[in-house]
Amino acid sequence: MATAVETHLRTSDFYFKIRLLYKDTGLAINTANADDITVEIINQESQEIIAIKTLSQDSASGYESIILLDPTTDGYIDVPMNKEDFIDSAGTLVDKGMYEYIATVYETDSNFIGGLADFQGFGEAFILA
């Protein structure tokens, strides 16, 4: 059985839902025993899911970037995992100052647990630990 922990980030244009699934190992919740991390980028006005990014943990090397869901093709594509690689429904790249916003939320949002670590999905510092 796994334990899910969710938190939410919002900007004027996008809504980020970060979900971590943890193995029930009796250990404290941290990234070392997380099964996967899923990030959904949602247009707040239309509630359309623009992109989905999933990381899975590799026991030997830690977190590895797996896939970016491209809603325009309903398929999974392999891309370099920088924040500029997120695309919107029109196929254009999305860059909304994610790093600055995420850092601000971390400093002010009590829903965050733990600290910052490298989250390759945005190419910036961001993992719930």
Question: Where do the protein language model's features map onto the residues?
Answer:
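Contiguous segments within soluble domain cores/interaction surfaces
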Residues: 1-129
